[in-house]
Each structure stands twice: as C-alpha cells, then as structure tokens.
Amino acid sequence: MAFHILKNENHKTNLVPIVEDILSIDSAMRFAAIIDLKGNISEAIMKKGKTSLKSQKEEEHFCKQVALGRRMRNEFNKSLGKVNYVHIERERVTQIVVYPKRKTIYVTLEPKLNMERKMELVHLIKKKTAHL
C-alpha cells in the first residue's frame, strides 16, 4: 500500500496514513505508535477489533520508557554501533521498536508469527518510516 506524506496547515506531517499503513502490513498487527524523542505519542492507533492489553495511561507511560530506552541505547552507539531495532517477546504480545532519525516507531503484534515473518515486518516498518 503506497501513501503520500500529507502535511497539515502547520506544515506538520500527517502521521495517520503512516500508522494505518503499518497496521495493514499483517493481520497480526495490534497497535502502532509514532513517538517523538521525548516520549510523547505523535500518533497511535489500535487496530480495529483488537483490545488493548494496557490502559491509555499505561500506554503513555510505556511510550515514555521507550524514549528513555532509546536515549540509553544511544550511549553505546559509538562502541557497539547503532541499534537496528528492539524486539521483545512476551507471553501475550510481541513488541517491536524501530528508530528512524527523529521519531520512534513502537508496534505490538500477536506472538503467533514465526521469527522469519517478524523480521520481514521489521524490515517493512523500517522501510515505511525511514523518512521520519
């Protein structure tokens, strides 16, 4: 699915089509968020028909933690290299975090997918968000 980068009247990128595009990659996708470098949610969508495993307050807190994790990982970029992505397997959900230049992409998906498919999803998400 292709999309155009839309800008609103304040010349800010409309992130809704990007988040929708991420969610459409696979039926196992549950939630997608674009987070600024301070941990504020710029845009987030829970896929229709899916129920959140966290409250909105917990989701916002988790996004702040994702941004903090990014800052902590950046401390090791010089010695270890940049982080390609973060992948967390939990009992009820898989969490993936990708780091474009100015935003952080956080997605959750059903854990049922095999590892090869999850790596394909990481690649697709990185490709769709490289400009952020």
Functional labels for PLM-detected ranges:
Residues M1-L132:
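Non-catalytic interaction/Regulatory regions outside core domains
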